């Protein structure tokens, strides 16, 4: 929007539409003026939306929203006839909806109204509004199936517009080229989108993420997935294919210079919102509808058809393109730490997005991990993941990023061929600067991962899983510096560790089992480890000397008082825990460890006495459970919210200032045009 007079007119029109009976002149101006994102965020104030939403003037807000939806559906329905004549009506409708929806989701009453409206039949809605629309000079002739709801109609039209010639893709683009960016499925686009097309793509990707953001205003136990369910259950296979290719390519793969440097902010917005949308869609492997909407409180599981289609991605070259692009982002923190290159802006930009996408690929795309065997930079990817996981493990602000890197690394080393590839020494790899966290890198990546993780303070289950996977899968190779892992094993075998929780006990068991498995299968190359164990065998007391009966007695005396035993006050939970620990001790392979501490090192007794108890190989993979999905969803939204509120690029945050319920929000300032001193003075003079 250009002149000050136009800004004043738009501000007055918005106030009139919210506070007075709808008038033709007001609506005509709202949907014909030239609006920008900053105009909408600056002149449709949060307090105005809330006042209207929470008063008897809510109907005005509801009418404005419904007209925006009708504009989008009707213009898309007859695009060739109405575009570009009604271009501003289409763009302004998306902009206004993007601004209004978070505040409607924020309130329980208005959120319920939106949900009811979305589920209502579209044709019926048009019929109900005809008298009012006639007064406003709005006439809609839309051809849609009678069964379409308002939300389905809106989503269908939005997705159609995402790949509409002349709006988001070039009018010269072939059917195969009607996606946003080159990458998977199509390596090159002969007629790439123009500057305006990119603007429209950015607008639509932002709107789709905002549409999904209703879960931001739900408690963690009562998440409403109605919008998401509608998105993933559309009968639109061709559209889904374009959505996957466009949003994946734009968010993670296409690194070409679309425009001049002055357009970097818009490019950044498009890239981020594209990556966020595809991540949010693919994150929900087991979608469950809001339970409190049903009388029995159980809800209904709905299949994610878009994810199912994504799982059918099968071309090796596509997987390798994705892996290469993700790894470029993941390498930024380590390169920055080593100061190999100079970064403009935040070097962590898109690292979380890439980690989350990689995590979803490794857990929900069956073929991706197998295809990484053909990825020449798999060792580099492991090193990057290790650095991110360890470097930011103690940083509360980056705990999600650290955990994602750990899960991804665990999944990579659950593949035996990738572990074997990681055993080859490659000193050309960029490694972390030597520090208390990272020793000098003079070995293979697989051994280096073990060295680093074994020296962490208070390792988590992720670290134990990673170490165990490597030890179970590593080929015959000497472990030169065994002190860190011996120290770690002696630590986890202390009663104060394994008695603290069953999870700790499980971590102790998996670490000891994998270590013994490694020794048995690499005995001749690792005699120095046997010698080290024997030298430090006192570190494994008292557990190494206990029989099963002695362990049971220890458990009882440590956890159950004598008076409780005498009076029969031990509850079933206590008895169950005792049985669990007794079985745990029985399966702990103490006899094998005891043998390692006493045997001669001049021959391999495990070969000569095959009847001795052996260790069963077990690989610990990441399973995308409901709990992990919920954790991921909450953290994705927390990251999106933080990025849009604090991002230096100036991307406006649609949710800024709203009362989010999904997680705790720290007070931050929005670095957008709203912080401009001149604009603040301008608003103060005109709108106070």
Swiss-Prot record:
Pfam families: Hid1
Record-level GO cellular component terms: cytosol; Golgi medial cisterna; Golgi trans cisterna; membrane; nucleus
Amino-acid biosynthesis recorded as keyword: no
UniProt keywords, alphabetically: Cytoplasm, Nucleus
Location(s), subcellular: Cytoplasm; Nucleus
InterPro entries: Hid-1/Ecm30
Paired cysteines (S-S): none
Source superkingdom: Eukaryota
Major localization listed first in the record, in broad terms: cytoplasm
Family recorded in the similarity comment: Belongs to the hid-1 family.
Protein name, as recorded: Hid-1 family protein P19A11.07c
Organism: Schizosaccharomyces pombe (strain 972 / ATCC 24843) (Fission yeast)
């Amino acid at each position: 929007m250009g002149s000050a007079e136009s800004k004043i007119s738009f501000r007055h029109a918005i106030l009139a539409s919210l506070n007075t009976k709808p008038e033709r002149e007001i609506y005509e101006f709202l949907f014909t003026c030239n609006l920008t994102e900053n105009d909408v965020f600056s002149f449709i104030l949060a307090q105005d939306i809330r006042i209207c939403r929470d008063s008897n003037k809510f109907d005005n807000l509801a009418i404005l929203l419904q007209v925006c939806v009708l504009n989008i559906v009707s213009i898309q329905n007859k695009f060739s006839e109405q575009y570009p004549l009604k271009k501003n009506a289409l763009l302004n409708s998306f902009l206004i909806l993007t601004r209004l929806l978070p505040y409607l989701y924020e309130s329980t009453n208005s959120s319920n109204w939106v949900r009811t409206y979305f589920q209502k039949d579209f044709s019926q809605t048009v019929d109900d509004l005809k008298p009012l629309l006639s007064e406003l000079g709005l006439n809609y002739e839309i051809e849609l199936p009678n069964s379409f709801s308002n939300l389905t109609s809106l989503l269908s039209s939005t997705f159609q517009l995402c790949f509409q010639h002349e709006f988001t893709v070039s009018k010269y683009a072939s059917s195969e080229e009607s996606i946003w960016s080159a990458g998977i499925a199509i390596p090159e686009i002969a007629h790439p989108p123009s500057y305006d097309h990119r603007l429209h793509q950015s607008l639509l990707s932002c709107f789709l993420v905002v549409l999904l953001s209703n879960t931001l205003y739900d408690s963690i136990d009562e998440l409403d997935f109605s919008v998401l369910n509608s998105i993933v259950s559309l009968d639109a296979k061709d559209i889904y294919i374009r959505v996957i290719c466009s949003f994946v390519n734009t968010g993670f793969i296409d690194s070409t210079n679309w425009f001049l440097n002055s357009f970097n902010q818009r490019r950044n917005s498009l890239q981020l919102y594209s990556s966020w949308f595809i991540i949010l869609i693919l994150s929900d492997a087991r979608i469950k509808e809001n339970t409190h909407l049903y009388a029995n409180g159980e809800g209904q599981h709905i299949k994610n058809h878009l994810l199912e289609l994504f799982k059918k991605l099968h071309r090796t070259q596509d997987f390798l393109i994705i892996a290469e692009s993700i790894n470029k982002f993941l390498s930024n923190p380590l390169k920055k730490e080593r100061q190999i290159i100079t970064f403009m802006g935040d070097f962590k930009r898109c690292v979380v997005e890439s980690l989350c996408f990689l995590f979803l690929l490794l857990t929900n795309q069956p073929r991706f991990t197998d295809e990484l065997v053909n990825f020449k930079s798999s060792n580099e990817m492991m090193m990057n993941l290790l650095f991110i996981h360890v470097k930011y493990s103690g940083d509360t602000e980056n705990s999600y990023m650290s955990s994602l890197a750990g899960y991804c690394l665990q999944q990579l080393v659950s593949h035996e061929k990738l572990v074997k590839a990681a055993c080859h020494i490659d000193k050309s790899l960029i490694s972390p600067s030597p520090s208390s966290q990272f020793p000098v890198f003079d070995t293979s990546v697989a051994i280096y991962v073990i060295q680093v993780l074994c020296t962490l303070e208070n390792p988590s289950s992720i670290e134990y899983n990673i170490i165990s996977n490597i030890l179970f899968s590593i080929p015959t190779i000497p472990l030169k510096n065994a002190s860190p892992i011996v120290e770690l094993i002696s630590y986890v075998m202390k009663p104060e560790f394994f008695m603290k929780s069953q999870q700790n006990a499980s971590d102790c068991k998996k670490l000891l089992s994998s270590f013994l498995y490694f020794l048995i299968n690499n005995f001749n190359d690792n005699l120095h480890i046997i010698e080290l164990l024997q030298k430090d065998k006192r570190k494994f007391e008292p557990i190494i000397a206990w029989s099963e009966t002695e362990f049971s007695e220890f458990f009882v005396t440590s956890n159950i008082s004598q008076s409780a035993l005498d009076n029969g006050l031990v509850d079933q939970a206590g008895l169950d825990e005792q049985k669990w620990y007794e079985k745990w001790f029985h399966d702990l392979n103490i006899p094998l460890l005891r043998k390692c501490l006493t045997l001669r090192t001049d021959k391999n007794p495990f070969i000569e006495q095959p009847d001795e108890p052996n260790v069963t190989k077990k690989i610990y993979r990441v399973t995308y459970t409901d709990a992990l999905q919920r954790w991921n969803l909450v953290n994705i939204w927390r990251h999106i919210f933080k990025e849009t509120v604090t991002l230096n690029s100036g991307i406006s945050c649609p949710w800024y200032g709203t009362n989010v319920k999904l997680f705790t929000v720290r007070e931050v300032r929005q670095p957008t045009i709203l912080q401009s001193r001149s604009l603040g003075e301008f608003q103060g003079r005109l709108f106070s």
